[in-house]
Amino acid sequence: MKCPFCGNRDTNVRDSRSVNEGTFIKRRRFCGECGAKFTTFETIQLKEIKVIKKNGSCESFDREKAMRSVEVALRKRPVTRERVDELMNSVIYKIERIHDAKITAKVIGELIMEELATLDKVAFIRFASVYMNFENEKDFVQLIGSLTS
């Protein structure tokens, strides 16, 4: 594993732990070159997932890209990193269980919204406003109304 601080390719694992009922491994690493310590996470990927984007192009599913969009929605919200990882694991599990090797970006967005709706309503609204291309305050009012009814 490459050190994110100095670029050295020779790092050592100091500690490994199974997390989230064994669905991923948390590793504490040490760089012998610069002395930096950092954490990595390994996740299980059962099959290659291809995402069909709105414009028709196709690309490999990028967990980190999806995770970043969720983290933006959750910024300054009282949700732990572990809970975000659990949310993403749940989304990926649903994708792999329900769909073939290809899935639309629309379905992925809906699965993320479904998970966020149960985790944090504010993050759900933030994510939905970007995902659903809200144009004005009426879009927010309509979504919030659907949450309270």
Swiss-Prot record:
State the free-text cofactor note. Binds 1 zinc ion.
- Keyword entries, A-Z: ATP-binding, DNA-binding, Metal-binding, Nucleotide-binding, Repressor, Transcription, Transcription regulation, Zinc, Zinc-finger
Necessary cofactors:
Zn(2+)
> What InterPro entries does this protein map onto?
ATP-cone_dom, NrdR-like_N, RNR_NrdR-like
Domain spans labelled ATP-cone: 49-139
* Protein task: Negatively regulates transcription of bacterial ribonucleotide reductase nrd genes and operons by binding to NrdR-boxes.
Q: Which family does it belong to?
A: Belongs to the NrdR family.
Q: Under which name does UniProt file this protein? A: Transcriptional repressor NrdR
Recorded source organism is Neorickettsia sennetsu (strain ATCC VR-367 / Miyayama) (Ehrlichia sennetsu)
Q: What is the lineage of its organism?
A: Bacteria, Pseudomonadati, Pseudomonadota, Alphaproteobacteria, Rickettsiales
